[in-house]
Amino acid sequence: MPVTKSYFMTVVVVLILVDETTGGLFGFRSSKRQEPWIACELYQGLCRNACQKYEIQYLSCPKTRKCCLKYPRKITSF
């Protein structure tokens, strides 16, 4: 009897975890629409048509836009 109870609890825990994970049991995301991945957001940049004065272009964004990253400090001219 104790073996059956532990087996049942294991099955219940696995089913709860499968339901709560975003990818499901095998990693498929069929119920949710997957958004396109933008590399610019990984570096906390913004996609713009032109970068501002204190930003640098690092990568390209979709639709031929520029990925603008802010400098860590304000750069002053000498």
Swiss-Prot record:
Localization per Swiss-Prot or TrEMBL: Secreted
GO cellular component, one term: extracellular region
Major subcellular site: secreted
Keywords: Antibiotic, Antimicrobial, Defensin, Disulfide bond, Secreted, Signal
Top-level taxon of the source organism: Eukaryota
One Gene Ontology term from the biological process aspect of the record: defense response to bacterium
Tissues in which the protein is found: Highly expressed in the cauda epididymis.
Function: Has antibacterial activity.
Protein name: Beta-defensin 29
Gene name of the record: Defb29
